[in-house]
Amino acid sequence: MRLRHVVSSLDLTRDDYFRIFELADKFSNVKKLNYLSGKVVSLAFFEPSTRTAQSFHTAAIKLGADVIGFASEESTSIAKGENLADTIRMLNNYSNCIVMRHKFDGAALFASEISDIPIINAGDGKHEHPTQALIDLYTIYKVFGEIDGRTFGLLGDLKYARTVNSLLRALTRFKPKKIFLISPSQLKVRREILDGLNYPVIETENPYDVIQDIDVLYVTRIQKERFVDELEYEKVKESYVVDLKLVNMMKKDGIILHPLPRVTEIDRKVDKTTNAKYFYQASLAVPVRMALFYEVLGERKDD
């Protein structure tokens, strides 16, 4: 069954995740395919992006699609006063799929409700970033061969980081042993996210209390751009630094992930450890997004 919109991690079933992982395996080493020849992908990035935009662009090209779009709101008619709905309607005329990033929570869902073509959410405010969760889980699957039964530690800004929301929701499709949520009290996971989870969650402020139990340490930067109060940001901006002292307390086969960009939350000395998998994680973005494009736009014998 072809996917329609991918606005939230919850739009994917467990079977969807594994089917995308299988496709990503097949796409990992290909140079160019023509599966999406004749298709046009719009990259509608109303908010700045480097890795996400470029990896989506590369994924579309490697499948044979043409790519149009923009990299900032200032380069669109929105700067002249056009509303989001009209922009989405116009992009419907030019393309077969819209990959969208926006600063407002819920923007991708809004777009999906008026769009006749698939919307893929590339990040909307502090809400979700479902394709990053796909990459995160695929990395874990590649390293361990499974996702079920693992203990996770999510560390840093758990209030404003949309990658955290998507990962927590995606994990409801699996069977994690437990999740440690490690953050300052000001940056705890929001209640509406916690209420939808179906696995054990333990909140703490001290990573040293739980690091020895963790298989996957998922680190996020403090999201300065999401803070309304500059003083609040200053209080928490360097709450945690993952350094060699912390890493040396991890399980030998434990891994460290980060959606990037990194600022100061992971000491660069950690990069050379066997636990550091965040650059490997980033390298999987293109095959995962190729797999997603294929699921959304590829021809099906049963269509």
UniProtKB/Swiss-Prot annotation:
UniProt: L-aspartate binding residues: 80, 162, 221
GO terms of biological process kind: 'de novo' pyrimidine nucleobase biosynthetic process; 'de novo' UMP biosynthetic process; amino acid metabolic process
Catalytic activity field: carbamoyl phosphate + L-aspartate = N-carbamoyl-L-aspartate + phosphate + H(+)
UniProt key word Ribosomal protein: no
InterPro entries in the record: Asp/Orn_carbamoyltranf_P-bd, Asp/Orn_carbamoylTrfase, Asp/Orn_carbamoylTrfase_sf, Asp_carbamoyltransf, Asp_carbamoyltransf_Asp/Orn-bd
EC number(s) from the headed UniProt entry: 2.1.3.2
PROSITE patterns given in the database record: CARBAMOYLTRANSFERASE
Binding site residues for carbamoyl phosphate: 51-52, 101, 129, 132, 260-261
Subunit text: Heterooligomer of catalytic and regulatory chains.
Similarity-based family: Belongs to the aspartate/ornithine carbamoyltransferase superfamily. ATCase family.
The protein's name in its UniProt record: Aspartate carbamoyltransferase catalytic subunit
Source organism (scientific name): Saccharolobus islandicus (strain M.14.25 / Kamchatka #1)
